[in-house]
């Protein structure tokens, strides 16, 4: 089942925590789920080119039910903040209008964007929309992630690859990506690329390392984290979606 399910959801409560944290009554949960969805949609649409990797929403204190703390993790904080904070103030005003609550917006910088699955997938989608060859896009993304300190990377692109009449899936992987190991810190993202031939689906898995007892995800995601595993590096391999038989890449 590790190959089929979303790695992020599978590890919730084990090594990952929730992006929305509340202290509310059960009756309020449906409305807050909808509100969180609208908040994230508004932020992503308001700043489309700001490379947002994660949006955390907190409502922890019952005395301050009308106050929401939103933390936006982005590789380009200047795009969200704007000149003298103008863009940030406009975004806060729109969030207050949407929620009818007091909003505290924190903008946090992501320093190592080449290791974050969502940002990698978004960058791949942009390159595919600019008509770059899909195999080159995958190999470039994998090499950047490994150079940034990732222990394993796997990518998969599905659709009319290269404008072919019949849709198919093709992927590339390097290093270890142990999807069945629950203590393995795996970052996963799925993004769509809208091309002239149709929509391409992009999936990215990043293996940062194993979260040992007494550690957290922050320990495995440090830039150039030490690789204590004795497992030798694996050869790059290409594969097709829906087929578990991996095909070794051709030797030079």
Swiss-Prot record:
Q: Which UniProt keywords apply?
A: Ribonucleoprotein, Ribosomal protein, RNA-binding, rRNA-binding
Compositionally biased intervals (Polar residues) = 241-252
- Domain KH type-2 positions: 39-111
Please provide, in alphabetical order, the Gene Ontology terms of the cellular component aspect for this entry.
cytosolic small ribosomal subunit
Q: Which SMART domains match?
A: KH (SM00322)
Kindly state the subunit structure of this protein.
Part of the 30S ribosomal subunit. Forms a tight complex with proteins S10 and S14.
**What name goes with this protein?**
Small ribosomal subunit protein uS3
Q: What is the lineage of its organism?
A: Bacteria, Bacillati, Mycoplasmatota, Mollicutes, Acholeplasmatales
């Amino acid at each position: 089942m590790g190959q089929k399910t979303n790695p992020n959801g599978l590890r919730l409560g084990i090594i990952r925590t929730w992006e929305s944290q509340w202290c509310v009554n059960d009756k309020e949960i449906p409305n807050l789920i909808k509100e969180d969805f609208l908040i994230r949609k508004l932020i992503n649409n308001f700043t489309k080119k700001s490379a947002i990797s994660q949006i955390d929403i907190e409502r922890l204190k019952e005395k301050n039910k009308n106050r929401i703390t939103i933390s936006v993790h982005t590789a380009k904080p200047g795009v969200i903040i704007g000149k003298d904070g103008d863009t940030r103030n406009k975004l806060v005003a729109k969030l207050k209008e949407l929620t009818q609550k007091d909003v505290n917006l924190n903008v946090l910088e992501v320093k190592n964007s080449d290791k974050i699955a969502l940002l990698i997938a978004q960058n791949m989608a942009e390159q595919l929309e600019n008509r770059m060859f899909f195999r080159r896009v995958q190999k470039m993304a994998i090499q950047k992630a490994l150079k940034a300190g990732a222990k394993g990377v796997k990518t998969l692109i599905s659709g009319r690859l290269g404008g072919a009449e019949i849709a198919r899936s093709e992927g590339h992987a390097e290093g270890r990506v142990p999807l069945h190991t629950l203590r393995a810190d795996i970052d996963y993202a799925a993004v769509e690329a809208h091309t002239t031939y149709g929509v391409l689906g992009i999936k990215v898995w990043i293996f940062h390392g194993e979260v040992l007892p007494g550690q957290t995800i922050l320990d495995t995601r440090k830039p150039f984290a030490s690789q204590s595993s004795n497992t030798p590096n694996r050869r790059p391999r290409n594969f097709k979606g829906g087929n578990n038989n991996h095909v070794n890449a051709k030797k030079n």
